[in-house]
């Protein structure tokens, strides 16, 4: 995906990028400093959440948030991230109830990546994969169900 100059100066995207970068830095600090691991994970989570809030269309923001939850051992938080992503993608979050027996700490990041591969948040990537008329009809029906 190419960034245009308009993307670089979009205030919400810039804030999302800044918070994501901070979250990644705190994740690295959590790995490097076991004594302050929990504190750094909390800061990483706070920044990762802010990144998603400022720009929920950036797949990296979702990936970093899921990684923070996984490293923190928060299976319930991972499920909540997936539910939120499913809502953003126009999917029924109740579909996750089929996965109640699955260990979210092991599978959530893979599920998140699979969901983003099936329904990219980038509009151009989505159009390339779903631009056919029958796909658009399915998408339209899915949106009306929400």
Predicted regions and their residues:
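Residue at a conserved register position within TPR or TPR-like alpha-solenoid repeats
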Residues: 26, 68-69
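Intrinsically disordered, low-complexity, charge-biased linker/tail regions
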Residues: 1-38, 80-146
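Helix-start (N-cap) detector for alpha-helical repeat units in TPR-like alpha-solenoids
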Residues: 16, 59-60
